[in-house]
A protein has these predicted regions:
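The beta1-alpha1 cofactor-binding region of Rossmann-like NAD(H)/NADP(H)-dependent oxidoreductases
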Residues: 55, 75-89, 120, 232-233
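Residue(s) in the substrate-gating loop at a strand-loop-helix junction
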Residues: 156
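Short, small/polar-rich loop/turn modules that mediate ligand/substrate recognition or access, typified
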Residues: 188, 193, 249-251
């Protein structure tokens, strides 16, 4: 992938903000997930990296986590299957003993010019991976999360400003924003926080893999900053939301959009 995304490999500096915490990150093999895994490890967290089947990419992320002196656990599997979601959490509990941070970040998208072009199977898969997996992961993790734990959903600017050619994807990202808002209210009495992050155009492998070439070439130019963001520019937000510094932040959605407002 050219240019190579910046995941903070050479730039992110930790300060112990997540020392001793145990994190689960889905879609952690590349893109935003890799950047978050690197940042979490450099802040002192052990990380379970859930991914589909990109073993080489996942091993590269694990190498960065271990280089930071933290434990990396790799778990391949298709999150469209609820049983896989439960197995991810089971593995985290087996190795770590608990879950302090859950980042539901894995996503699937395809572009289509008309509604009729969208295969039923693709609609179902998009909802299963992007939205239903978030539910199944959270439900499985909650018995192993204590006060001070944090749940973070990767939403999108498309939740408020949907791109019509990304209809299924946009619908799921709006769902994630609403799910975290509801979770924040349901889980407050347990001391568990839930928030979402709404990225704008971020340069990840998902972009050239799912978009027409002409859209890839102009990707990010539509926002006020006139460029795509890098995964490394998102990671500090995920660190904040996972840390005790955000102890009164729950039910929020933080936009990282290059100047495109979400109101």
């Amino acid at each position: 992938m050219e240019p190579t995304p910046d995941h903070g490999e050479q730039s992110y500096r930790g300060s112990g903000r997540l020392s001793g915490k145990k994190a689960v990150i889905t879609g952690g093999d590349s893109g935003i997930g890799r950047a978050v895994a690197i940042a979490y490890a450099r802040e002192g967290a052990d990380v379970l990296i859930s991914y589909l089947n990109e073993d080489e990419d996942a091993q590269e992320t694990a190498r960065w986590v271990e280089e930071a002196g933290q434990q990396a656990v790799l778990f391949p599997g298709d999150l469209a299957d609820a049983a896989t979601c439960r197995a991810v959490i089971d593995k985290a509990v087996e190795v770590f003993g608990r879950v302090d941070i859950l980042v539901s970040n894995a996503a699937f998208q395809m572009t289509h010019e008309t509604i009729e072009e969208i295969p039923d199977e693709e609609w179902d898969r998009t909802l299963a991976i992007n939205l239903s997996a978030f539910f199944h992961l959270t439900k499985a993790a909650l018995p192993h999360m204590g006060p001070g734990s944090s749940i973070i959903g990767s939403s999108s600017v498309n939740s408020d400003n949907p791109v019509p050619t990304l209809l299924p994807y946009s619908a799921t990202k709006a769902g994630i924003a609403n799910m975290t808002a509801s979770m924040a209210q349901l889980l407050a009495e347990r001391g568990i926080r839930a928030n979402s992050v709404a990225p704008g155009p971020i340069w990840t492998p998902l972009i050239p893999a799912t978009m027409p070439e002409e859209q890839v070439e102009s990707f990010g130019q539509q926002v006020p900053m006139q460029r795509a963001g890098q995964p490394a520019e998102l990671a500090p937000v995920y660190v904040l939301l996972a840390s005790d510094e955000a102890s009164y932040v729950s039910g929020a959605r933080i936009a990282v959009t290059g100047g495109q407002p979400i109101l």
